[in-house]
């Protein structure tokens, strides 16, 4: 697989070495890790699945491995959809490639998951990791998508871990790593009330004084029974009306959420296309392309806002030059 910058070996063949700015050469190395084809240019060892690679871990073993390495309390593979665990793995494998202060270890919402995967993408770029992160699939919390990615990441970890000691709790600097909620968990968790407690006779039984020995308890009149049954029927109708209204609200919120998700996926696809175009022309050392890449990989909104005016100024300055060339 070709490297980012290629050079020729003494015999005239392409050996995929990297020539740095100071003229030094980083030799290309080829690795084989558990049947994987992996390549390295002095940074991360890239791992690519092949047909002979069938060794995988079960869902329980892979979660136990994640919890043991980075001291988390995950119970399901789907909880890896927050991206926080991967960010800490990258800090462990390549110290300094990611800032754990910006990682949302208590992420519970999808936009927070995307924020973490954005940081992960930036760290992949810094370490020349070629793996494409399927963010739009992972943040949905589906089992198979997250299982496939963590299986690949386990092989990537085995290829790059050098055995150094690492304290994940200290590296998080006191941030509580709370597992994200299980996907599909109900938002509304209303406590159930016992039928006996809501019955009109229960309150009457509690409030009635103890009968004296020898005295005959008086029976409730027919008027009282009718009024109690009428109030119970009215309360049941009110509850049914509330249930209908809540169901309508839930339905409308689901429709709104689906619309927002479609819009998000649409713009995410556009950004992905821009990213691929920038990567294709990244070797041309175009300043505008570099600034666009910095905006795409910005770790927070403030960085993107501060970089956007500069990119626009550079684009405006370059337009007259391009017109003159044509």
Swiss-Prot record:
Span list, region Disordered: 170-239, 297-326
Changes after translation: Ubiquitinated in an ASB14-dependent manner; leading to proteasomal degradation. Phosphorylated at Ser-235 by CK2 leading to enhanced cell adhesion. Phosphorylated by CDK1 and AURKB during mitosis reduces the binding affinity of MAPRE2 for microtubules.
Keywords: Cell cycle, Cell division, Cytoplasm, Cytoskeleton, Microtubule, Mitosis, Phosphoprotein, Ubl conjugation
Residues in the signal sequence: none
Entry-annotated residues carrying Phosphotyrosine: 166
Free-text tissue specificity from the UniProt record: Expressed during early stages of apico-basal epithelial differentiation but down-regulated in most cells at later stages.
Annotated PROSITE patterns: CH, EB1_C
Region ranges (DCTN1-binding): 186-326
GO cellular component terms, semicolon-separated: cytoplasm; focal adhesion; microtubule; spindle
GO biological process, one term: positive regulation of keratinocyte migration
InterPro entries in UniProt: CH_dom, CH_dom_sf, EB1_C, EB1_C_sf, MAPRE
Segments of skewed composition (Acidic residues): 300-312
PANTHER family named in the record: MICROTUBULE-ASSOCIATED PROTEIN RP/EB FAMILY MEMBER
Subunit structure: Interacts with DCTN1. Interacts with APC (via C-terminal). Interacts with monomeric and polymerized tubulin. Interacts with SLAIN1. Interacts (via the N-terminal region) with BAG1. Interacts with ASB14.
Domain remarks: Composed of two functionally independent domains. The N-terminal domain forms a hydrophobic cleft involved in microtubule binding and the C-terminal is involved in the formation of mutually exclusive complexes with APC and DCTN1.
Function comment: Adapter protein that is involved in microtubule polymerization, and spindle function by stabilizing microtubules and anchoring them at centrosomes. Therefore, ensures mitotic progression and genome stability. Acts as a central regulator of microtubule reorganization in apico-basal epithelial differentiation. Plays a role during oocyte meiosis by regulating microtubule dynamics. Participates in neurite growth by interacting with plexin B3/PLXNB3 and microtubule reorganization during apico-basal epithelial differentiation.
Protein name as annotated: Microtubule-associated protein RP/EB family member 2
